[in-house]
Amino acid sequence: MSKDLIARYRNAGFEAVADGAMAFFDRRTDLQRAGVAFGPGGGVEPAKVSTDISLVAIDRSDPDAFGLSEVILRGVAAGLERYVHERPLFRSVCPDQELFVMPIFNLQRYAPGEGFKQWHCDWTISDEATEPVHRVLAWIL
């Protein structure tokens, strides 16, 4: 049983998911947008500088994006299962026993010199499908 909060998992399956996401990002320039971070604002430079593609995992209108979303969700679900197996307390502290609710996520690319420029959060605290105020775990792939 691990007591570390942060875990790193690596295997050929996860690497294939990452390669697929990178290829999708390069191929789908039509979906790329300037990254957005929510914060106090008013600064000279934005909280982050990136190029993002937002995906909605339940949206079947774009078969290419939906297919990638499905692969990413399966990969994250496998990582989550391993994570909570190593940390069983997570299963007991989540009241609804639902640890994976995330139909919306971003692919973010940072070119040299880009990235986080100031304190920020990626989501507001408004009522959104991602329920950010109730987030227990976040994934960076």
Predicted regions and their residues:
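Fe(II)/2-oxoglutarate oxygenase catalytic core
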Residues: M1-L141
